[in-house]
Amino acid sequence: ISMGIQSFNDDKLQRLGRIHNAAEAKSAVNLAKVSGLKSFNLDLMHGLPNQTLEEALDDLRQAIELAPPHLSWYQLTIEPNTMFAYRPPTLPDDDELWDIFEQGHQLLIEAGYQQYETSAYAKPGFQCQHNLNYWRFGDYLAIGCGAHGKLTFPDGDILRFSKTKHPKGYLRGEYLYEEKNVEKNDRAFEFFMNRFRLLEAVPKQEFEHYTGLSQSAVKNQIDFAIQQNYIVETPDYWQIAEHGKLFLNELLALFLDE
């Protein structure tokens, strides 16, 4: 079970358009704990409108106090066709965001959480297996209204698809909403867009297995990424470097089909 807490600050929750408050969020977490759930996740956001460093850290402290086995800590992104897109709020600048991440990350590490993905932290043994499969470019089924899926076929074709979003259409039997084949020219970008979010090393054989491409297809991009200190390379693995984490968008852009 995953709970979209987002913040324990009632003013921030209202600004985000959420219908719950901090007390209700904590009550839901405690209900999950007393019901016997061994594993659950809390979603938190940072970089919220007018959010200070201390407010962001206070959200984390309150989350840590609830002792979730897994915690997802995302930076707010402004999506198209949303209230924030039409009326952009004042957000923390890059320096403030870095302070929030650096100090928040340290709080989580000191509390016994291990970061295994850009926005995911877990107690030992509680990494989300679905997340790991997803970020490793594995396949997954779309079960239910609005669900997304990915399938790789024996001939190497890769299909992404989604189910009907509205329950009324789904109940009428209109299950499939959209499907798209992942073209060969896009597979390297999609693979690394997923794998480089994980902090673990990327086996080179997995690149070939999941994309159907040879390593030579990305040799120039890999060589440039190494020169820029975005990644390090061994005979068997590629590993994102600290510098690459800071410039992830620039690293991924190398693999875009032009």
Per-region residue spans from a language model:
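C-terminal scaffold of the Radical SAM
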Residues: 1-213
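Short, amphipathic alpha-helical interaction segments positioned at domain boundaries
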Residues: 243-258
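Short amphipathic alpha-helical interaction segments
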Residues: 212-226
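Minor-groove-contacting beta-hairpin "wing" of winged helix-turn-helix DNA-binding domains
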Residues: 237-241
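Solvent-exposed, charged/polar functional surfaces in cytosolic regulatory/catalytic domains
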Residues: 107, 224, 254
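A short, conserved structural fragment
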Residues: 226-236
